[in-house]
């Protein structure tokens, strides 16, 4: 049986439901049918055979605002970073489109906040199920627009979907409190309520997972969102919008406004300064994060930020070399070194240094294969663009000019302008760029140290503190170092630490707040104290 929610006071759209498990029915003339023809780019569907047979419905190029697919006045090209070929032209949203998206989200919030936690949970679960059903197509979209090896893209889609599953469950666990006061005729209650419209700005390196980690929590809490995806990877965000629509997520709850690099600054400013936006969630560089914090300050908006890192990877003399090398490979070369928690500097104690460097170099030569992300066996795809390659190249040249030794790699790869050889440097010192500037590429610089105190001092010298790793077999040392490292996340004898169940975030200039875990939903909730008197 269908049930309708109609709140005239908030000017929201009519939302049609069936309980339980029915899709939203948009009003006539509203939402473009999810199953209808999609204006997906032919180039993307045919790219290198890797996207042959991909569902056209998932290849969207327009913005998604208020439950409708809308073009913009202009478009911008999205390129395959492996070949440089154009994948398609995407709507280039500007300030007008950004404000319209915020308005749509605000109007939808009036109704969405009143939807029961059980129903929000059900809708998120449907979205999760659709991601799993379409996981192969979604993975191929990621590989096409980011260059990520297809095996890793599949892993990201599962990771991404698991956030929707997790927060579908957390939606039903938003509890308040009862506080007993000294006054016998009073009771004090603490309510948790959704904060409002959230502006969500996401990066290109995890174009799906960074959306669901934020949006899953926001929607579970009862918030609505406006997503501005990275200009390099908008197709993943738009594909998620299509699946959200198919899942029955109401019109205006999830909005996507892609834009070009030229418009990114003004669009970001527009959504972050709009008075109808109550929350900003951003993943990206520390530099950009500071700009957005300035925008938020004028209207005192709630902010969550996951910014840059300079993750140390410490190997103590007591470590198992083989385990440390395996952890280093996983931590450094996932997504070709383009993750915010990638190890950026390897601190290796003198007694184990030579054995570690030798084993690390051998593992790199044996296990890393540079190639197109769609090619079977590829472990290292292209960097996102030539600017990223230039940064790695600059760091390598700087280190070598100051005395570092190239153990393996060290130059651009013959495959193309966006490829760089996996590189290992030794004899690295702290005056080199690669030790105090986030690389975001396949470069592993090794610094030799003598004492535990020295390693901790080097690791904590950074003004950022997202993740840190260390390998040791000494239980007392493990506790000391884990507590002393100034980071938000620590991997002890482990190189891969991200999990939907665990809090993700940093300290210092690596950001504010936590994502994922049971704490992630709190970023989108406000506490309200209610004093009930006269009892």
From Swiss-Prot:
Record's catalysed reaction(s): succinate semialdehyde + NAD(+) + H2O = succinate + NADH + 2 H(+)
Write down which residues bear the modification named N6-succinyllysine. 126, 135, 184, 265, 402
Q: Where is this site: Transition state stabilizer?
A: 205
Q: One of this protein's GO BP terms? A: central nervous system development
Q: How is its activity regulated?
A: Redox-regulated. Inhibited under oxydizing conditions.
In this UniProt entry, the residues modified to Phosphoserine are 499
Subcellular localization: Mitochondrion
Residue positions of the PTM N6-acetyllysine? Answer: 126, 265, 365, 411
Catalytic machinery residues: 306 (proton acceptor), 340 (nucleophile)
User: A Gene Ontology molecular-function term?
Assistant: succinate-semialdehyde dehydrogenase (NAD+) activity
- The transit peptide segment here is 1-47
Cellular component GO terms, alphabetically? Answer: mitochondrion
Q: Which keywords describe this protein according to UniProt? A: Acetylation, Disulfide bond, Mitochondrion, NAD, Oxidoreductase, Phosphoprotein, Transit peptide
Q: Which InterPro entries match?
A: Ald_DH/histidinol_DH, Ald_DH_C, Ald_DH_CS_CYS, Ald_DH_CS_GLU, Ald_DH_N, Aldehyde_DH_dom, Aldehyde_DH_Superfamily, Succ_semiAld_DH
Annotated disulfide bonds: 340-342
Q: Which residues does the annotation say bind NAD(+)?
A: 213, 228-231, 284-289
SUPFAM superfamilies, per database record: ALDH-like
EC annotation from Swiss-Prot or TrEMBL: 1.2.1.24
Source organism, top-level taxon: Eukaryota
Q: How does it assemble?
A: Homotetramer.
Q: What does this protein do?
A: Catalyzes one step in the degradation of the inhibitory neurotransmitter gamma-aminobutyric acid (GABA).
| Protein known as | Succinate-semialdehyde dehydrogenase, mitochondrial
Tell me which species this is from.
Answer: Pan paniscus (Pygmy chimpanzee)
* Origin organism lineage: Eukaryota, Metazoa, Chordata, Craniata, Vertebrata
Q: Which gene encodes it?
A: ALDH5A1
């Amino acid at each position: 049986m269908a049930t309708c929610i109609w709140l005239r006071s908030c000017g929201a759209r009519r939302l049609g439901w069936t309980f339980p498990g029915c899709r939203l029915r948009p009003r006539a003339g509203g939402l473009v049918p999810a199953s209808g023809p999609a204006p997906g780019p032919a180039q993307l569907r045919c790219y290198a055979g890797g996207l042959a047979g991909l569902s056209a419905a998932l290849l969207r190029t327009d913005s998604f605002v208020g439950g409708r697919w809308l073009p913009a006045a202009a478009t911008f090209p999205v390129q395959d970073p492996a070949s440089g070929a154009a994948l398609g032209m995407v709507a280039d949203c500007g300030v007008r489109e950004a404000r319209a998206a915020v308005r749509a989200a605000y109007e939808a919030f009036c109704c969405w906040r009143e939807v029961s936690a059980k129903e929000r949970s059900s809708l998120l679960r449907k979205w999760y199920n659709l991601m799993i059903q379409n996981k192969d197509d979604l993975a191929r979209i990621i590989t096409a627009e980011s260059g990520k090896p297809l095996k890793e893209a599949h892993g990201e889609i599962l990771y991404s979907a698991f956030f929707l599953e997790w927060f579908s469950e957390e939606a039903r666990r938003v509890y308040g409190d009862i506080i007993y006061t000294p006054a016998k005729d009073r009771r004090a209650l603490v309510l948790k309520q959704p904060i409002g419209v959230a502006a969500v700005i996401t990066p290109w390196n995890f174009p799906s997972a960074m959306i669901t980690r934020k949006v899953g929590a926001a929607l579970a809490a009862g918030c609505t969102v406006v997503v501005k995806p990275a200009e390099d990877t908008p197709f993943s965000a738009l594909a998620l919008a299509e699946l959200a629509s198919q899942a029955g997520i109401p019109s205006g709850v999830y909005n996507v406004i892609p834009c070009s690099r030229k418009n990114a600054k003004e669009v970001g400013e527009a959504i972050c300064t709009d008075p109808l936006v109550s929350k900003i969630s951003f993943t990206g560089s520390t530099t950009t994060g500071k700009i957005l914090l300035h925008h938020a300050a004028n209207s005192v908006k709630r902010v969550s930020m996951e910014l840059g890192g300079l993750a140390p990877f410490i190997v103590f003399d007591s470590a198992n070399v083989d385990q440390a090398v395996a952890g280093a490979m996983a931590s450094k070369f996932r997504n070709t070194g383009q993750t915010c928690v990638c190890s950026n500097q390897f601190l290796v104690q003198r007694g184990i240094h030579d054995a570690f460097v030798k084993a690390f170099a051998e593992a790199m030569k044996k296990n890393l294969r540079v190639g197109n992300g769609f090619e079977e066996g590829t472990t290292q795809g292209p960097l996102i663009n030539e600017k990223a390659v230039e940064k790695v190249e600059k760091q390598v040249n700087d280190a070598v000019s100051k005395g570092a030794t190239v153990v393996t790699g060290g130059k651009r790869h013959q495959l193309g302008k966006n490829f760089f050889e996996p590189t290992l440097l030794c004899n690295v010192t702290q005056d080199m760029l690669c030790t105090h500037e986030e690389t975001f590429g396949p470069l592993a610089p090794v610094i030799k140290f003598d004492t535990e105190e020295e390693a901790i001092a080097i690791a904590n010298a950074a003004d950022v503190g997202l993740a840190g790793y260390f390998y040791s077999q000494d239980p007392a040392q493990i506790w000391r170092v884990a507590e002393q490292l100034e980071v938000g996340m620590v991997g002890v004898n482990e190189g891969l630490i991200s999990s939907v169940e665990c809090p993700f975030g940093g300290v210092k200039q690596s950001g504010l707040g936590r994502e994922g875990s049971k704490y992630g939903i709190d970023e989108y909730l406000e506490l309200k104290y209610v004093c009930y008197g006269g009892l």
